[in-house]
């Protein structure tokens, strides 16, 4: 999905950075490819401060950043739980969120449809919330599901 989304943005004149799971960078050829694409690794098993700082810097510089709110790939028609990282980064940098729905193809890179929603900003969380960015993360997922629903796709929200 990251490669498909990168290509869709790249072909429209953008060169986004990508935050990807560290496992993708273990193979030297894959590491070269993803680094060339502007990707950088995140260790999903812990609070990876290096990756978070890099992502915040990318956004503060006005660059686009591809990040999947679930933190992993999710099977078609299923839903992963939204992690709060994407929402936290958007709020802290004042960056807009561009929701994207990718309809998978039957074969690699064939039949995939990338649909962009309208950019939106997340509100700052209220003080004292247990998980201050959870509402924002859920809002991002709702926007993505709305795009899927508008395309007639089966989404976790109908």
Where on the chain are the PLM-derived regions?
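Catalytic core of membrane glycerolipid acyltransferases/transacylases, capturing the structured
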Residues: 1-46, 54
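Non-catalytic C-terminal accessory region of glycerolipid acyltransferases
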Residues: 50-158
